Amino acid sequence: MADLQATLDSIYTDILPRIGEGKVADYIPELAKIDPRQFGMAIVTVDGQVFRVGDADIAFSIQSISKVFMLTLALGKVGEGLWKRVGREPSGSAFNSIVQLEHESGIPRNPFINAGAIAVTDVVMAGHAPREAIGELLRFVRYLADDESITIDDKVARSETQTGYRNVALANFMRAYRNLDHPVDHVLGVYFHQCALAMSCEQLARAGLFLAARGSNPMTGHSVVSPKRARRINALMLTCGHYDGSGDFAYHVGLPGKSGVGGGIFAVAPGIASIAVWSPGLNKVGNSQLGAVALEMLAARTGWSVFGD
């Protein structure tokens, strides 16, 4: 592990000439304001070492990466019963596709596309007012990262609320098929706030370390999920974590991961480390263009791909 900082530094040097590539998510007004010429990366190893480079301490909107934490909460509440509400298969469609949801009777393909994440949020809301569910998620993420400074960006949440028409349509479809138990506006209120979680690369890598360490956080001693559940969440991230770019990410990077349209990607090298990278410019399927390039470089230079070096 001693040369990990040198590896990160070399990746940063190779990425620097390309910083600014990709297009920021302009359909969310607050994200459209983000300067694309930023790049950060952090690695937290299972033995507690932290390596960082670039803008790794700048908080950004984690967006769909939050779905990993919400899924963990939902599985903790209802266990395998969750899979009656949402599938475990790659979608092959855009993350906000309506056609597939209608064709499959209101059961989303997986928990990482928007419809699936909205159904997962509905599960977490059981017994909670919307504000309480938002608070539960924020407390959980702070607990995972051991960092009380993590917040939700209310401006981003409001921005999404004002423009999230497709998500409103998805939620109404599921409500019509009786796959949402709570009022649509309540569920979406929580969903938009969870997507507005603001975290730095280092905070994100710390929060997700339990998935690299068989369900426990070795830095805090907290047991989060069973080894079996950690393995299964990682499997879902590998197959479904990058929308209709999931196969391409597995091919080039070979690590379980989850992307967000804020430009972040969270990835796991099981038994070794958790990784977070951020570069706001997105590729055509909504994943960080340079984030994916940096992770491909990391996997190639470390041999961390789950498929071998």
Curated annotation (Swiss-Prot):
The EC number(s) this enzyme carries: 3.5.1.2
GO biological process: glutamate biosynthetic process; glutamine catabolic process
Catalytically driven reaction(s): L-glutamine + H2O = L-glutamate + NH4(+)
UniProt keyword annotations, A-Z: Hydrolase
UniProt binding sites for substrate: 64, 114, 160, 167, 191, 243, 261
InterPro entries: Beta-lactam/transpept-like, Glutaminase
Molecular function per GO: glutaminase activity
Subunit structure comment from the entry: Homotetramer.
Family membership: Belongs to the glutaminase family.
This protein's name: Thermolabile glutaminase
Native source species: Rhizobium etli (strain ATCC 51251 / DSM 11541 / JCM 21823 / NBRC 15573 / CFN 42)
High-level lineage: Bacteria, Pseudomonadati, Pseudomonadota, Alphaproteobacteria, Hyphomicrobiales
